[in-house]
C-alpha cells in the first residue's frame, strides 16, 4: 500500500510517500526563517509560501517517483490555519483527480500521534502526551478511530508559552529550540518557579508559569539587579518539562495502557525526550525528523486507519 501524505497546517510545506508505512520519500520546506523577524507566523504570507513551495516539492517528487503508483492521497484537514489548510486540500484534490486515487482527510493531531508509528509499533490502548505550539493534550487512544482527550491546556499551549517567554527575554523566534539550546548549555542553579495547577485532574495551564517568568524578569529590571537571561530561560524549561512529565505520570497511574507516546512539535525538546523515556519502559518518542510537522506522519495515520478497516 503506497500513500502520499500532504501537510500544510501551519508554516511547513511537507509531502511524503510511504509504502507499507515505510518512508520512501519526504520533502519539507520550512517558513521559519521568513517569520523570525515578525516573531510569529503571518497567515497570509504563509499561504502564499505554501502555494510556491508545494509546487517546488511536486517537481522534486515527479523527477524521482511515479505518482501513478500511489494508492491513496492523504492530507491534513484540521486543525490549523484556514488558508494554509486550503492549499493542501486543493493540492490533494488535484493529485487525486489527476491519478484517479481515493483521498483521505486526516486530523493533524492524530497525525502527530502516528509519527511514532513510522519507527515503532504502537500497542493499544495508548496514552499520548501531545505537545505543540497550538496544543497541549493528554489523549487515550483505543484504536486508530477512537481518540479521547482526557486532559488539555485551559489557556496557552506549551509551545506558545516557549515562544512568548523567548520573545519577552528577547531571545528570538521560534522560542522552543532557542530555549532548549540554552538549557543544554546551562550548568548553574535553577530559579524555583512554581509548577502550575489547573482545574481538572489532567488539564494543563501555562499562562501562570509564563506570567511568573515575565514578572521575575520585570522585577529584576525595576530593581536594577543583574539579570541572567540564560538562568531564567533554563529555569522556565525545567519547570515546564517537570509539569508535563508529572501530569503524564498521574494519568499513567490511572489508565492501564500498553504504550506511552510523546508527540507534537515540542517532542523535539531534548529534556522532555529524556525525561519521557524515563517514565516507563513502554514509552515511545518519535524520531526527530518526524517530531515537527511533516507529510510522513499524515501518510502514516492514513495507513493505520486503512489497516483498521
UniProtKB/Swiss-Prot annotation:
The alphabetized list of GO BP terms reads: tRNA threonylcarbamoyladenosine modification
* Molecular function as annotated in GO: iron ion binding; N(6)-L-threonylcarbamoyladenine synthase activity
* EC main group: transferase
Function description = Required for the formation of a threonylcarbamoyl group on adenosine at position 37 (t(6)A37) in tRNAs that read codons beginning with adenine. Is involved in the transfer of the threonylcarbamoyl moiety of threonylcarbamoyl-AMP (TC-AMP) to the N6 group of A37, together with TsaE and TsaB. TsaD likely plays a direct catalytic role in this reaction.
HAMAP family in the cross-refs:
TsaD (MF_01445)
Which residues are substrate-binding? Answer: 130-134, 163, 176, 180, 269
Cofactor (UniProt): Fe(2+)
Q: Which keywords does this chain's UniProt record carry? A: Acyltransferase, Cytoplasm, Iron, Metal-binding, Transferase, tRNA processing
Query: What EC identifiers does the entry list?
Result: 2.3.1.234
Q: What is its main location?
A: cytoplasm
Tell me where on the tree of life, at the top rank, the source sits: Bacteria
> What is the name of this protein?
tRNA N6-adenosine threonylcarbamoyltransferase
Q: Tell me the first and last residues of the signal peptide.
A: none
Chain positions recorded as Fe cation binding sites: 108, 112, 293
- GO CC, any one term: cytoplasm
- Name where it's found: Cytoplasm
Work out whether the entry's keyword set contains Nucleotide-binding: no
Task: State the family named in the UniProt similarity comment for this chain.
Answer: Belongs to the KAE1 / TsaD family.
Q: Which SUPFAM superfamilies match?
A: Actin-like ATPase domain (SSF53067)
**Entry annotated with the keyword Ion transport:** no
The gene designation is tsaD
Reaction(s) this enzyme catalyzes, per UniProt: L-threonylcarbamoyladenylate + adenosine(37) in tRNA = N(6)-L-threonylcarbamoyladenosine(37) in tRNA + AMP + H(+)
| Pfam families recorded | TsaD
Q: How is the cofactor bound?
A: Binds 1 Fe(2+) ion per subunit.
